[in-house]
Amino acid sequence: MTPEAQHWQRFIQSMTDRRQEIIRKANLPTTSQRDAHDMLCAVPGYDFAIDLAIEYRNAAEGVPA
């Protein structure tokens, strides 16, 4: 894996971990419905960023789109 691809892989992993943490916190019984809604509204943005980073990682590895 190239250094650039390694960078993107670390970024993908950190974004995936953060996304999972948001979902976990939003589903805690102590989280208000309003806060949970606000947290979960961020998830599609994380999904988009992760998908884009996967494309960049693949491009760094020379994988055709």
Where are these regions (language model features)?
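Glycine- and charge-rich intrinsically disordered segments
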Residues: 1, 61-65
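Short, charge-rich amphipathic interface segments used for partner binding and complex assembly
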Residues: 7, 11, 24, 28-62
